[in-house]
Amino acid sequence: MKTKTREWIVFIILLIAIALVSFFAISVGTSNGFEINVSEEDTTATPAETTANADHEPVSVERQVYDILVEAGISHAGACGILANAQAESEFCSDNMENYYNKKFGVTDAEYTQLSDLEQVDFVNDSVGYGLWQFTYYEFKQALWDTAKTKGTSVSDVKTQVETLIEILKTPEFSKLFRFLKETNSPENAAKEFMLVFERPANQSESAISTRAVFATEFYKIFN
């Protein structure tokens, strides 16, 4: 009898111990807010991504650029040729710094942009290709810098860059190209002329021209 009684007592004590451990585990888990925090992170992350997508999809950089160009009198085909060059030069990243200099200076696109806006680098004269069309010549970068300062924007601002481009195209050096872009009905020719006359990239092969022509044709279909 004494042995059985002891076994029952031990058994009951074990049950009580298990119950107490479970109770305290639940209490601690609830009181430290861990489960609530995880839930909050999950629910806040999704709406943020959705909002970002909703904000950018209706008015893409491509659409912003196209609309400003057309408003300036450039034809549908001409605008698509310019878009094709932006695609080839920067993939429509308006803060794009020429990749070679990212590695050389050890800075990101965003860091270079911030340093430029704060006048902590010689943005105008450093020969670093920048922006949608990779402005490199000091005349182009000076024009972009002046426009940004006048408008109170960053040099990475899309509208500022497009308006700067238009003003450059109006100068005597590019007046023939500007007139051509206003009159042309060929997106492929627009892409080619803009590339050879304005961009003047190191690679001017038929393959490079063809790539930009294909981009122009695609934009022509999208915005038609």
Model regions: which residues?
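Non-catalytic cell-wall polysaccharide-engagement segments
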Residues: K2, R6-N37, K141-N224
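Intrinsic disorder/low-complexity signal
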Residues: R6, S39-E41, A48, A88, ...
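N-terminal export signals and maturation junctions of secreted/periplasmic proteins
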Residues: V10-E71
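Generic signature of intrinsically disordered, low-complexity, basic-rich segments
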Residues: E40-T46, C80-I82, L144
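Peptidoglycan-targeting cell-wall enzymes and recognition modules
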Residues: T46-Q64, S90-K182
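Short, well-structured alpha-helical segments
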Residues: R63-Y66, A79-A84, E188-K192, A213
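Cell wall/extracellular polymer interaction/catalysis modules
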Residues: I74
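Short, functionally critical alpha-helical segments immediately adjacent to catalytic or ligand/cofactor-binding
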Residues: A77-C93, Y100, M195
